Regions:
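Short, polar loop motifs at secondary-structure junctions
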Residues: 43, 147-152, 221-227, 292-295
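Catalytic binding pocket for nucleotide-activated donors in carbohydrate/polymer assembly enzymes
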Residues: 21-24, 40-41, 229-361, 365
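A short, glycine/small-residue-rich beta-strand->loop->alpha-helix junction that serves as a flexible
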Residues: 9-21, 196-200
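Extended catalytic core of nucleotide-activated donor transferases of GT-like folds
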Residues: 9, 23-27, 37-154, 269
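Short amphipathic alpha-helix
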Residues: 18-29, 204-206, 353
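Well-ordered beta-strand positions
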Residues: 89, 141-142, 162, 257, ...
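Conserved catalytic-core segment of nucleotide-activated headgroup transferases in glycan assembly
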Residues: 171-257, 265
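Carbohydrate-associated surface elements
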Residues: 149, 166-169
Length: 369
């Protein structure tokens, strides 16, 4: 099958979490023999920021770890949309300009014989609904939503049975436990400051508990304003800046535990969506403690795959327990890995995507018969 995917950027993961899952699932599809072609706009915001901060060397991790993947750029929406001709499946991610989304839809309406899907992995459907409603999706066959609560938003917008839950997942080809265990020390958090969506929570569930539990804290991520960096210094946390996503497994392997601090939209308006770092951390075999969120889809076995706490004091206690109890750490790692391998790999998501495409095509095939 020829698969065309339109993304904000395949090459850059600078403040671009969707690149993590996209690389993993497209790599899986390539491995299965599909002809995968990726297109991104010239001068994408994420790529420009990566190059500004790190130059061409910032791209080396992607090219070294994903030699089977590449992307081509386009300068105008119509030029980009034209690349969909001849495809069997076209997926357009929500972090594309509305002009590109509309142009691909027009191509489909003019006789494009491909299945056309819109892929939403963000909270804008609830945080900025007017923006999302402005996308022209009339000619799209379906929507891929990265959680059931987001899917229900699209159902209310009239998509009915044409919206499908397609969670993110771990790329087990690259995100896996170290082959040999070495000394682990301290707490690590890989994540961006959060645009004001979790600033207080980072202090309550990461910085203060890490300090109070007596654990050194290492932080990786971007978009930390000066006042955020001062806050890190106040609690003795070490800030390292951007980390290429493919380097995350090695960083996890050096640390005793990690923490998940969800953005407020994923604890209030869109519960049940863990975002990709939970999948990746568990796949790497690092014990994880999470700030509260509602796993309403039962993606994990909370309390077995990872610990979840209600407040900062409970987080401090959980981190102390992990630091002092190697059996607890081993139990969490074993359980978390089991759940990822059984349900949440990019291989599972590739299977789900093929099932979705078959389901969307089935009525056409039946009527043609």
């Amino acid at each position: 099958m020829r698969i065309v995917y339109f993304t904000h950027s395949l090459r850059s993961c600078w403040n671009h979490g969707n690149a993590h899952f996209l690389r993993g699932v497209l790599s899986e599809l390539v491995e299965r023999g599909h002809d995968v072609r990726v297109f991104e706009p010239e001068g994408s915001w994420s790529l420009e920021n990566l190059l500004k901060d790190h130059g061409e060397s910032g791209l080396q991790s992607f090219s070294a770890n994903y030699p089977e993947l590449s992307s081509r750029t386009y300068s105008r929406a119509e030029e980009g949309a034209a690349q969909a001709w001849g495809a069997d499946l076209v997926i357009v991610h929500e972090w594309n300009e509305p002009e590109l989304v509309a142009a691909v839809g027009r191509l489909r309406a003019r006789g494009g014989r491909f299945t056309l899907l819109f892929h939403d992995t963000h909270h804008r459907a609830v945080s900025a609904p007017s923006e999302m409603r402005s996308y022209e999706l009339d000619s799209y066959d379906g929507v891929l939503a990265f959680g059931a609560t987001l899917a229900r938003v699209y159902e209310r917008w009239g998509w009915g049975e044409r919206v499908f839950v397609w969670h993110e997942a771990a790329d087990m080809r690259r995100f896996r436990p170290p082959e040999e265990e070495a000394r682990r020390e301290g707490l690590v958090w890989i994540g961006n400051w959060g645009d004001g969506e979790r600033s207080a929570e980072i202090v309550e569930f990461l910085l203060r508990p890490g300090r109070d539990a007596g654990l050194p804290v290492d932080i990786y991520g971007v978009r930390y304003p000066d006042d955020a960096k001062r806050r890190l210094n106040q609690f003795g946390a070490r800030y390292h800046g951007w980390l290429a996503n493919a380097a995350a497994p090695a960083v996890f392997a050096d640390h005793l535990a990690t923490v998940h601090v969800p953005r407020r939209f994923y604890t209030q308006a869109l519960p049940g969506i863990p975002t990709i770092r939970v999948f990746e951390a568990l796949a790497c075999g690092i014990p994880l403690v999470s700030a509260p969120w509602d796993d309403c889809e039962h993606l994990f076995r909370v309390g077995e795959d990872f610990l979840m706490v209600a407040d900062g004091e409970a987080m401090t206690n959980a981190l102390r327990d992990l630091a002092n109890d190697p059996q607890l750490r081993e139990k969490l790692v074993r359980s978390g890995l089991e759940t990822i391998r059984k349900r949440h790999t990019c291989g599972h998501r590739a299977d789900e995507l093929m099932t979705i495409v078959e389901r969307l095509r089935a009525p056409v095939l039946e009527s043609a018969a």
